[in-house]
Amino acid sequence: MTLRRNVVTGALLHDIGKLIYRSLSGNDIKRRWRHQEIGALWAKEAGFPDDVVQIIRRHHFLRRNDPKYAELSPEALGDEKLSLVNTIYVVAHADSIAAGMERERVGGDGYFDPECMLSPVFKDVVLTGKEPVREKLVWKPKKATDYNYPKAESEVAAGISGLYRELWQELNGELMQDPAGIAEDTLLLLLQKYTFFVPEHTYVREELPDTSLYHHLKTTAAVAWCTYQYLVANGTCWEREDLRAAIGKEDEQRYLLVGGDLSGIQNFIYTLASKGALKTVRGRSFYLELLIEAIVSRLLAALDLPRACVVYASGGGLYLLAPNTDTAKETISFVQQEVNRWLYRQFGTGLYFSLVAEPITAAGLARGLGETWYRVGQKLSVEKERKWYREIKEDYATFFAPRPAENTCPICHQAGKELVPYPVEEEFLVCPFCAQMVRLGQVLPEVKVFYRLPAGEKVAPRASDLVLEVLGISYLFTREDYSGPAAGYYLVENPWSLLRPAAVPAWNFPTGSYFTCKELDDLVKKGMGAERIGV
């Protein structure tokens, strides 16, 4: 766990000095100090472990004639600290891969501009019949919580170092609350909040950089940890071997791009027939997002991956980076079967989860993921065309056995479960799940945060609380303050505002924002004319 913390935390913070550097006003300091020195000095004063400080300080390879070789090069540490040197190598290599994914090589007619800003990735999108935008558009370096819209570079060119200074002062204030004990996921959340609109580098050519520092740090952490897992699984000795050459290989298929997709979403949400069905739609829509989150949590735990490895998870789909090891591939297959067995018990054949993986090299990551994305998509399409084939093959008799037809729920039409009173009209009986979805839909507009309960922890919910269990993970939704035990919490209304000490994992969950209206009737009343939606 200590090594994982050093690798992941060191990778997440390896370029923190870039933000500090840009916030400084004295050119003399900038001339004498490099960003890795400034970052390491801050990390040491903040109380981070020495290994993390050294990762930040020495994550660039230097020539032996560099005047700061002894201070900043990983090789200068010598063979006495091979474990640390290898850890620095793996972060440095991941940094190089991430940079290759994001930018052209330094050289040519470019120049460094510490006050350059981030360019929107959609700047090159040209609508049919429209002229491309000629003037450079930029994001101002602001927090993710601020309203930020792309503007012409000429409109916002002044006072940029002051904006960087504000960003750093606020980020530093939050990090210093518990720098040594901060959870990986909380650190990632804070970096997203403060570096989402900060460019990863300041080397300018014709185009401004369009990759954020946040995404660079996140990618570096993901690649570094997956590289470490791959090498250890293939027999390297981290503490006794000099692994620089092994770490630097770019032609081995060391990584897996894992893709997942949930089938049956539209029918799950909308194919409902009864007077109470509409009141379950909000809850069902949210539930699917929570289901994907639970699957992601299950995969990360089973594969021993940090959340930095999650590329995307929403809308019924997920993508993540994993090491290409036999154990990882077996785990991916096992988790898929585990999820589908659970889905079958809960919903019959209504929902099915496809999960596939495609190997890729370090060179492939740096070069571009287009072909790999395509192959993952093709594999998912094939997998979705043969739903339940494993389950049918393994247990044909049970899968096609007669099922009880009594106690059919009038909303979802699932049978065989004891019906309970409908939360809105008690004389109307529905299955327990549909009743929960109605309650969830009622609670969501008033929930600003919800909690993931510790495994095995029994919490007695209050009358206004709702506890949902998804894939064996219990989530507590409450309208009131909750100070009980929690394995982590999800921020809904204010996605980046920490509510607990930094050692408690925090995640944002903006897809749960339902604060505009509690009911469709309320939305209708806000309109003009006939009381119809869309009229």
Regions found by a protein language model. Name each.
Residues M1-K142, V198-V204, E250, Y270-V281:
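Divalent metal-dependent catalytic cores for phosphoryl transfer on phosphate-bearing substrates
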Residues G10, L257-G259:
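Structural motif
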Residues N27-I29, G317-L320:
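Conserved short loop/turn motifs at secondary-structure junctions
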Residues H59, S314-Y319:
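Short acidic-rich active-site patches of cyclic nucleotide enzymes
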Residues A92, R103-L257, G264-A313, L321-V535:
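Bergerat-fold GHKL/Histidine-kinase-like ATPase
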